[in-house]
Amino acid sequence: MPYKDVCVCGNAAGGRVREDDPHGSDASSHDAGGTSPGMLKFLAEVVNATPLNNVPPKPLNFPANVRIETYPGRSAADVHFEGRGADIFFNYADTTQRTLGDWLFNWCVANCATYKIQGVIFGKRKWFSELHMGKVNENYQGGDHLNHIHIELNCDGANLR
């Protein structure tokens, strides 16, 4: 099934990028049918290549082929099912892989407006544009992001608006 825009835009609350999140509705209304054009562009230009704005600089040992999961995620009413969430797999417990995941986390926060990145989670760090006044939470206790970095775009980023 081809991708379709199923996003419901939220209201800006003063963050660098507006956050759009599905809440309390049935999963079928969030089925985008595939990965969004904006997420595909982000993955191609940042994860699989050297980003045009390479600040902070991408590590030279960043793997050319890293495991990535996007749509459908767990097929729930979430950003993966809407085609605008991606998990890029790096092991937080491995020092080298943590360095690579930390670079991607830092790059996403620093360049959030370019791709309309609304949130990033990796290991003990979590950042959302409109959460904690846009500051990184350095002591996130979520626990389920120790083997991957989670990145999500808002509706505008997903649909290249």
Feature-to-residue mapping (PLM):
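Secreted/periplasmic proteins that engage bacterial cell-wall peptidoglycan
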Residues: 2-133, 146-154
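Short proline/glycine-enriched turn/loop segments at secondary-structure junctions
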Residues: 136-143
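Short, charged low-complexity linker/loop segments at the C-terminal edge of domains
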Residues: 156-161
